[in-house]
Amino acid sequence: MKPLELDVFLCRTDNFGVLVHDPETGFTAAIDAPEEAPILEAATRRGWKITHIFTTHHHTDHVTANLALKEQFGCEIIGPINEAVAIPGLDRAMADGDSFLFGDHTVNVIETPGHTAGHICYHFVDDKLLFAADTLFALGCGRLFERPAADMWHSLQKLAVLPDETAVYFGHEYTLSNARFALTVDPDNERLKSRAAEIEALRADGKFTIPTTLGLEKETNPFLRAADPAIRRNLVMEGKTNEEVFAEIRKRKDHF
């Protein structure tokens, strides 16, 4: 089985567009459809025909180009069953634990409510790829629009059990702000400090910070580290639950 090929580019202001291409079948999936023109440019540049859209959630900046791409390519749109009525052009609705094949590549669906009520992530099992959209960012997580903090904490735990080497592709280039915030709640984390310096340099050069890895996030992302004693001491929350610590971190980030 040939490895998948990926193309990553910016859409809108800070959305990531991602195309996933299977060279054996010619299938090409857009991970969400934030904006038509950059997606078409990337597909044309690579000589790929878009056959699928894997929608993660219903927010406008992730589904804007669904219908235009479907009209042009006749692509199949897959998306979350619990947001089915809000996904333009949806063909197949997926629930937590569902799986399907993209060529010979197995894709598992992980429902991660928090940012939205029915948000899903796509895990390419053998390829060790996770498309986490607005659930898990590099050094961050999505804002809580439709579900409480406890739900998002448990959603993140569902991702955290995947292999550490899993490459994580996320929905927005928020990493620099996330790094600066992370240092306020985990200031003595040496790995975080070195990573923040790397991110500052990357962004100064106009380079992307995508992908990250799950292992790196577990070492440095405060939203995955609510159980960490140092973070709890810094927040003066030693006796609180993981959900309460996570909620406090999310609240602080909202006002950062």
Curated annotation (Swiss-Prot):
GO terms for biological process: methylglyoxal catabolic process to D-lactate via S-lactoyl-glutathione. Binds 2 Zn(2+) ions per subunit. It catalyses: an S-(2-hydroxyacyl)glutathione + H2O = a 2-hydroxy carboxylate + glutathione + H(+). Its cofactor is Zn(2+). CDD domains: hydroxyacylglutathione_hydrolase_MBL-fold (cd07723). Zn(2+) 1 binds at residues 57, 59, 115, 134. Pathway: Secondary metabolite metabolism; methylglyoxal degradation; (R)-lactate from methylglyoxal: step 2/2. The keyword Zinc applies. GO terms for molecular function: hydroxyacylglutathione hydrolase activity; metal ion binding. Zn(2+) 2 binds at residues 61-62, 134, 172. The keyword Cell wall biogenesis/degradation does not apply. Thiolesterase that catalyzes the hydrolysis of S-D-lactoyl-glutathione to form glutathione and D-lactic acid. Monomer. Belongs to the metallo-beta-lactamase superfamily. Glyoxalase II family. This is Hydroxyacylglutathione hydrolase. It comes from Rhizobium johnstonii (strain DSM 114642 / LMG 32736 / 3841). The gene is gloB.
